[in-house]
Amino acid sequence: MRTEHVKEWKIAVLGAGTMGQCIAQFFAMNGHLVSLYNRTPANLEKALVQIKNNLGTLVQLGQIPPEAVSHTMESIYGTSDLKEAVAEADIVIENLAEREDVKKMIFSQLDEYCGSDTILSSDTSTMNIFEFLEISHPERLIITHFFNPAHVMPLVEVVRGPETSDQVTLAVKKLLEGDGKTVAVLNKAIPGFILNRITLAVFREASYIAENGWASPEDIDKAVVSTFGPRYTFEGPFGLSDFAGVDVYERLATLLPPVLCSDTECPQMVKDMVAAGKLGVKSGEGFYRYRDEAKVRRDRDMRIVKTIQAVRRVNEEMA
């Protein structure tokens, strides 16, 4: 394993869906040679077109110069041949279906095709791959959980397995941080990792309030965006508790838990929406209605980029 010169690492990304294409774009933008694998050539072509569109948006926002578009696209090699995709990779990042059988099959092939020092990673958001994957040299197996859109969102959760080595963990952390990501290391693969657990805890309570008719989804969203929005750009729950007062949080944590939602099932409201085909942006309606999916997604990405830019400027000014 090459722990030095991580900027020279070759990256193989498996799966050219939404996450895979964005991860490939991110590494290519940062100067890496990237092979992007998808078994369906048509889907691979669509992914490359979307990457070029994403780059165009970043040019419009002033994030990258126009010439970076061609440089980035030239750094991505699309292929439907798995063995070819991973042949010279320093790290392989898997982004295939969240199914145990799929991951078992692909990692078995990776074990055959890759050298013993190639880091094998999964972008799974829900699965404890360490419980069911069997590979030689398990010390090189790790989870790198990116967030959508992966070429924009700063965070990557790096999750260690019981046999993941310190050397591999540090090398992956160095790679990601060197390319500008913020890394949060989780020392045990707990379900949902860090962010999905917190996200679902908030969503469960928000759904509970809405289902009981205490507030509308719109007003709940307004309350969260107008408070968590600005605060959570620079402090997390522990930093926030320090400013509010740990003694205040002690009282809240004593009084509120008995009346908070403790359901262990999916909210009925959500089940009903799925049954009715109200799946969100991709179906045109969820909690809100949407007309032009491409425009809605593009506008959202632009909001995220501009917010990150603004936060970075403030942090630099306040440093």
Cite the ranges covered by each PLM segment:
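Internal alpha-helical scaffold of NAD(P)-dependent oxidoreductase catalytic cores
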Residues: 30-32, 158-189, 200-230
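Short glycine/serine/threonine-rich phosphate/pyrophosphate-binding segments
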Residues: 20-22, 103, 125-129
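NAD(P)-dependent Rossmann-like dehydrogenase/reductase catalytic/cofactor-binding core
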Residues: 2-7, 32, 181, 186, ...
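Helix N-cap / loop-to-helix initiation motif
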Residues: 7, 40, 65, 165, ...
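Rossmann-like NAD(P)-binding element
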Residues: 43, 57-119, 127
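Rossmann-fold dinucleotide-binding core
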Residues: 119-196
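NAD(P)+-binding Rossmann beta1-loop-alpha1 motif at the extreme N-terminus of oxidoreductases
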Residues: 1-57, 61, 113
